[in-house]
């Protein structure tokens, strides 16, 4: 605790002090509401709605509303659970649009009923976001008892539901579901052709459970709805065979690099160098030469070979940066990503930009084709669309700056209902990993012999299996919980607190489920937590510790560390390493040096800061795309709900004529110098005006403006003729034309937006090259993105008119293959070069903000 905090108290303490009077008001209403009948208590809901309609605010009725929920939950025929004062505090913080940090076992699920009920009274819908379908179903059934008792409707969105079921669930006052389901429904709603096919209402208020997992850990994982691609997969296997033959070099340290530079020696050695800290792998000059020979190309850096570079880079990353049983597993013949934060398998999720295919080639399983992105959004941008959002978690304080800067949410630590009894012991540090694991086994055996349950956390599947082998050699019965044994997760976690249980788990497997102590375990010291390695994030370490000591239970935690662990090896200071070497200690001697604890924490802070910078950097780029998405989806919604789109079509005709005239006739040209043949060809490709001729006698008086006016009038006349043709003189003909306009415009917007997403992604992957030209890549990206967006908008107008002028009504419509939804883990280190679209033009840079672009 800092000097000022000791004097003035920390931020959370001050905020809690402010809300204690509100808690007192809620508690004071308790006796009054206890005397109400079930019917009278239920009637309070309509009373609150009426008061809101007359001008009162949610803050005005909060004490009474929370007291009603508290009383309802406590009744034997509902939950028979009464909110503690600290839970009321958490509920107040969450209503204010903040994050309530509440320790494991403090009843966050019950806390959510308070702000959910209060905000549902406005009738605009409340979304309670959980991390998996099981919790969504459980909580909607369990906590739904309170809401249903009080006359509110409760829905639940689950994977596999059809549109009618989803629409009904979203129409409820309170809707439970996973972050993925909410996000995918938003994307799908922005792809429908008829408004009655939409399922979501406006995004009003979100309560996010495990908010750190959703908004921090998943921040770099975009949701993607994709269609099948058409590229061959052969080159993935060829590139894989090539990189497997390469010889690994090493990165020279600063002294070696300087000496090599002074002696004009080549600084690189080997065919490629791997930088584990930066998570990058690149070819050396020798490696480039081998690639040029292997693939029979003269210059690998030539723009013609950008795609080949992409395949080679992915093959390098797959073979030397991605590791089996750490980053992914092979399950039923498929590559399945392992969540680095939970150790769980993530079926259905794939690395993007071809990295997943490169791993498939590496492991010699079937290589699936790359997919085409139809719609995409990140959780950062999706949840920022809610008018108000809040969160709850056991671990958020270490990421407070990110929550505040990116999401506008501050973190308030809520006191525990009972004092924490868990003892968090000092770290024990060993020189080698082997020495560390021997010490861990000794500690496990000592606890096991007296019957104390032990939960051991490892950072990878490989490490969990190494420890399992050591325990088997010692004859210690134990359970292993990692991505390979995920099916037994609930059962294993449920038994982890029983006497004599030994459980090895990767990271936070089992998060969301409390570990309850078996009979007699409290007397033995409670659950013992052993961390076998510090995670890159202090928050993940805190989550592991938080498995013990729930609701005042006893428990203890300790981390064992070796100087060979990735965190210390990559981010520990050289000064620390030299100090340990000077001590001359053996493998099995623990290092008791206060400086090491500080070094470990500094290493973690360094990584956390680096990861925050990456997420912030990605958001800056994604914000450009987000502004464009807002414009496109806004335009799409206008078309979807538009009764009459004819005015838009008339506007398009004028805009296309004006652009085509300006493109072919410059202001300093005389009418006699105009190339009417080329002009006619360009315009007729869009509006079928035929060959445009200007009579000789009219030439002296002709101007660009007159030509635009004449051709716009002609375009409108031709469109009226098309309307009559489609209408066929029938009363419903105009209605048919308006419906046709709507469908055509939506299809064109969707197609051009898909192409634009692809182009923007390609451009973003290659934009880093601008840094070599001493230009800011982000600024260049914004300029280019604006021009690409304007060009896409023009193409939307042109293609819409092309189709409408030439359309023929047919009775049978071919059904398209439905798109797939997909998660993807972005490979942010890959350098993918922008491809050239056939209709791409040289773009003039204009420093105009995207938000000024209001029309498509």
Question: Which stretches of residues belong to each language-model region?
Answer:
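Conserved P-loop NTPase motor core
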Residues: 1-587, 633-634, 650-651, 655, ...
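Extended, charged helical/alpha-beta scaffold domains that provide interaction surfaces
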Residues: 328-336, 342-349, 551-552, 559, ...
């Amino acid at each position: 605790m800092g000097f000022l905090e000791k004097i003035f108290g920390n931020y959370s303490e001050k905020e809690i002090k402010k809300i204690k009077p509100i808690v007192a008001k809620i508690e004071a209403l308790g006796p009054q509401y206890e005397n109400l009948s079930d019917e009278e208590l239920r009637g309070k809901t309509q009373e609150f709605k009426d008061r809101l309609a007359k001008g009162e605010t949610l803050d005005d009725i909060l004490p009474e509303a929370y007291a009603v929920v508290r009383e309802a939950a406590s009744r034997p025929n509902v939950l028979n659970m009464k909110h503690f004062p600290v839970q009321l505090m958490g509920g107040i913080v969450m209503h204010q649009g903040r994050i309530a940090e509440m320790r494991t076992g403090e009843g966050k699920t019950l806390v959510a009923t308070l702000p959910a009920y209060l905000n549902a009274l406005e009738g605009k819908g409340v979304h309670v976001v959980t991390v998996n379908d099981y919790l969504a179903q459980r909580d909607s059934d369990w906590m739904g008892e309170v809401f249903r008792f009080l006359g509110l409707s409760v829905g639940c969105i689950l994977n596999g539901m059809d549109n009618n079921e989803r629409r009904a669930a979203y129409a409820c006052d309170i809707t439970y579901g996973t972050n993925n389901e909410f996000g995918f429904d938003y994307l799908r709603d922005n792809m429908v052709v008829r408004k009655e096919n939409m399922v979501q209402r406006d995004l009003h208020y979100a309560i996010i459970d495990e908010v750190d997992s959703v908004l921090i850990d998943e921040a770099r994982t975009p949701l993607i709805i994709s269609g099948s691609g058409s590229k061959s997969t052969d080159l993935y296997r060829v590139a894989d065979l090539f990189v497997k033959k390469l010889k690994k070099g090493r990165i020279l340290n600063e002294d070696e690099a300087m000496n090599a530079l002074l002696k004009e020696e080549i600084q690189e050695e080997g065919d490629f160098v791997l930088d584990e800290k930066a998570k990058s792998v690149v070819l050396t000059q020798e490696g480039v030469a081998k690639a040029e020979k292997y693939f029979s190309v003269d210059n690998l850096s030539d723009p013609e070979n950008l795609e080949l570079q992409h395949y080679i880079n992915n093959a390098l990353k797959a073979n030397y940066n991605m590791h089996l049983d750490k980053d992914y597993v092979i399950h039923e013949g498929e590559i399945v990503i392992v969540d680095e934060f939970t150790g769980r398998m993530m079926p259905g999720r794939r690395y993007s930009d071809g990295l997943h295919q490169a791993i498939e080639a590496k492991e010699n399983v079937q290589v699936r084709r790359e997919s085409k992105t139809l719609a995409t959004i990140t959780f950062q941008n999706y949840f920022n669309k809610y008018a108000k959002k809040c969160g709850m978690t056991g671990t958020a304080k270490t990421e407070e700056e990110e929550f505040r800067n990116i999401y506008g949410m501050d973190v308030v630590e809520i006191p525990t209902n009972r004092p924490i009894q868990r003892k968090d012991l000092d770290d024990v540090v060993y020189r080698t990993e082997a020495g560390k694991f021997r010490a861990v086994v000794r500690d496990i055996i000592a606890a096991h012999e007296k019957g104390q349950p032990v939960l051991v956390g490892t950072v990878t599947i490989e490490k969990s299996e190494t420890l399992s082998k050591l325990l088997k050699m010692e004859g210690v019965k134990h359970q292993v919980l990692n991505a390979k044994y995920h099916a037994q997760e609930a059962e294993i976690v449920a038994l982890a607190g029983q006497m004599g249980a030994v459980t090895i788990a990767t990271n936070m497997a089992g998060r969301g489920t409390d570990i309850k102590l078996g009979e007699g375990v409290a007397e033995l010291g409670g659950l013992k937590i052993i961390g076998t390695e510090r995670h890159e994030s202090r928050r993940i370490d805190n989550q592991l510790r938080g498995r013990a000591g729930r609701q005042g239970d006893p428990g203890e935690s300790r981390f064992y560390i070796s100087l060979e662990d990735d965190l210390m090896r990559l981010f520990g200071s050289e000064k620390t390493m030299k100090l340990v070497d000077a001590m001359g200690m053996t493998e099995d001697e623990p290092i008791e040096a206060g400086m090491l604890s500080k070094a470990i924490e500094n290493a973690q802070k360094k990584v956390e800061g680096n990861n925050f910078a990456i997420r912030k950097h990605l958001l800056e780029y994604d914000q450009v795309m987000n502004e464009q998405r807002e414009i496109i989806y806004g335009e799409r919604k206008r078309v979807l709900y538009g009764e009459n789109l004819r005015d838009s079509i008339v506007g398009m005709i004028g805009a296309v004529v004006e652009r085509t005239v300006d493109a072919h006739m410059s202001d300093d040209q005389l009418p006699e110098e105009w190339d009417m043949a080329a002009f006619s060809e360009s315009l007729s490709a869009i509006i079928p005006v035929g060959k445009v001729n200007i009579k000789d006698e009219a030439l002296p008086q002709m101007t660009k403006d007159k030509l635009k006016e004449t051709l716009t009038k002609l375009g409108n006349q031709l469109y009226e003729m098309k309307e009559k043709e489609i209408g066929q003189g029938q009363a419903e003909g105009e209605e048919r034309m308006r419906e046709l306009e709507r469908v055509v415009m939506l299809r064109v917007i969707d197609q051009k937006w898909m192409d634009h997403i692809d182009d923007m992604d390609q451009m973003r992957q290659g934009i880093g090259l601008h840094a070599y030209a001493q230009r800011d890549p982000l600024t260049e990206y914004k300029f280019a993105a604006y021009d690409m967006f304007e060009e896409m908008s023009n193409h939307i107008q042109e293609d819409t008119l092309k189709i409408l002028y030439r359309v023929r009504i047919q009775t049978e419509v071919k059904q398209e293959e439905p798109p797939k939804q997909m998660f993807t883990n972005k490979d942010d280190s890959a350098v993918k070069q922008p491809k050239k679209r056939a209709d791409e033009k040289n773009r003039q840079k204009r420093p105009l903000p995207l938000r000024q672009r209001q029309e498509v």
